[in-house]
Amino acid sequence: MGSRNIVQQQNRAEAAVPGAMKQKNIAGEKKNRRALGDIGNLVTVRGVDGKAKAIPQVSRPVTRSFCAQLLANAQTAAADNNKINAKGAIVVDGVLPDRRVAAARVPAQKKAAVVKPRPEEIIVISPDSVAEKKEKPIEKEKAAEKSAKKKAPTLTSTLTARSKAASGVKTKTKEQIVDIDAADVNNDLAVVEYVEDMYKFYKSVENESRPHDYMGSQPEINEKMRAILIDWLVQVHHKFELSPETLYLTINIVDRYLASETTIRRELQLVGIGAMLIASKYEEIWAPEVHELVCISDNTYSDKQILVMEKKILGALEWYLTVPTPYVFLVRFIKASMTDSDVENMVYFLAELGMMNYATLIYCPSMIAAASVYAARCTLNKAPFWNETLQLHTGFSEPQLMDCAKLLVAFPKMAGDQKLKSIYRKYSNLERGAVALLSPAKSVFVFLIELLMNAIEKIQCSLFFTSEIWCRF
């Protein structure tokens, strides 16, 4: 701690004449009272006669300001001592005393504020830490041994891998699902924001408008007569150059009416004409006139008969015409297929053949559309025949489509051999890619054979590995 020692100046004149200055010294002692002196560090000062005299200790009340001053002086002195590293130098009010003055420390009567130096951090290595350091390499060695054991192939892992290989389980990379609506974001007619919800709604209500098996309730009509009617309607549709939506809606109206009303044989064609008139008014901008339909039917029915049948059909269907036909799903599924025009023409060819055959009535419209896309890809060998994007948008997996696809693949060959060739001639034209002339798909049947062979191989491999395990043990 730094101290402030006040050295009294000795007046030589007073020392020479002590008697004369006695009264003055008494008054001087009162004035020179060391009220601010440090009682802890006193120094001896040589007098005039050369003898050392001790400076009397002075005490004063310790105030807060005085304590703060002492603490500041102590910190300043400690910093100066660290820098200069000088011994025996005493600073009094910032001024070094005379070299002739010898500094001597007197034991302090009171404890002054002491600034303790910051203790140095000492790291002690205990025997426990030494043991831990010795144990760490051992633990690392054990971990390395465990990892080596894990990497080493075991009998169980080998047999598991062989079983997966035998069962046909293959590790294949996850296919990326393509956003088929990305190109139509700026097309307002594509309604990209609502298209997914629309098709979810179509799939939820498609069974409500699907006709059931009605041939058992029609005494005068059979499946062949229905096929003849639809073949003729395809010709009328092509003659008037109507849209595909009109054809699919016409067939839907015919089946729904026949499922609800018993019809005699001579009125079957009239039902087809009335259904064509209703569908044309619903889908087309310019629908055919009634007299045009009379002419195309070779005047078999009059205008009044056609209008009466139109009203009768609408009453039986309760004017419910907004139904999801296979064409509604075909447009979406062809877009998800992302293929060329040949595949598109083949899809429509197979779908129309399916609509003409009564056997497809047991399948829902979305199933017929999805199976048509799958069969067309198989026919034109567009690998992969089915992918994640198609499965997402159709809602059907490849095995679910196999039964309907087999039925559709068999129709082209039958269409070429039968007399009902309206659809066959329509798609034999070069404008539609002449897809009707292509050979039917063999991929579907090959796929079924592969499934059968894989099942046989699984059984054989499981028996082989079971015997191998027993031989090892």
Curated annotation (Swiss-Prot):
Keywords: Cell cycle, Cell division, Cyclin, Mitosis. Coiled coil: none annotated. One of its GO terms (biological process) is cell division. Belongs to the cyclin family. Cyclin AB subfamily. It comes from the Eukaryota. CDD domains: CYCLIN_AtCycB-like_rpt1, CYCLIN_AtCycB-like_rpt2. Residues 134-147 have a biased composition (Basic and acidic residues). The keyword Transport does not apply. The keyword Cell cycle applies. The lineage of its organism: Eukaryota, Viridiplantae, Streptophyta, Embryophyta, Tracheophyta. Essential for the control of the cell cycle at the G2/M (mitosis) transition. G2/M cyclins accumulate steadily during G2 and are abruptly destroyed at mitosis. Interacts with the CDC2 and CDK2 protein kinases to form a serine/threonine kinase holoenzyme complex. The cyclin subunit imparts substrate specificity to the complex. It comes from Antirrhinum majus (Garden snapdragon). One of its GO terms (molecular function) is cyclin-dependent protein serine/threonine kinase regulator activity. This is G2/mitotic-specific cyclin-1. Residues 1-23, 134-155 are annotated as: Disordered. InterPro entries: Cyclin, Cyclin-like_dom, Cyclin-like_sf, Cyclin_A/B-like, Cyclin_C-dom, Cyclin_N, Cyclins_cyclin-box. Residues 1-12 have a biased composition (Polar residues).
